[in-house]
Amino acid sequence: MAKCEICGKEPRAGKNVSHSNRHTNRWFKPNVQKVRVLLDDGTVKRMNVCTSCLKAGKVRRYVSKSQSVALEA
């Protein structure tokens, strides 16, 4: 299920509305990414986090040493 483990954002029901004003059911799903997060105690955990939480800086992403060396070069 697409649910953010930080803010609790989850899919919401809504309607598609056509030009002729017909309503059909649909789901609005949050943009949830599976990322590796560095926790406060120093451990790394894979979590489902929405992109608005990532952009707001509510979590710290984990970058391995090999990735950080590649980023510097």
Swiss-Prot record:
Entries under SUPFAM superfamilies matching the protein: L28p-like (SSF143800)
Zinc among keywords: no
Keywords: Ribonucleoprotein, Ribosomal protein
A GO cellular component annotation in the UniProt record: ribosome
Molecular function per GO: structural constituent of ribosome
Top-level taxon: Bacteria
InterPro entries (UniProt xref): Bacterial_rp_bL28, Ribosomal_bL28, Ribosomal_bL28/bL31-like_sf, Ribosomal_bL28_bact-type, Ribosomal_bL28_sf
Pfam families: Ribosomal_L28
One BP term from GO: translation
Family: Belongs to the bacterial ribosomal protein bL28 family.
Family matches, as HAMAP family: Ribosomal_bL28
Name listed for the protein in its UniProt record: Large ribosomal subunit protein bL28
Originating species: Fervidobacterium nodosum (strain ATCC 35602 / DSM 5306 / Rt17-B1)
Protein encoded by which gene: rpmB
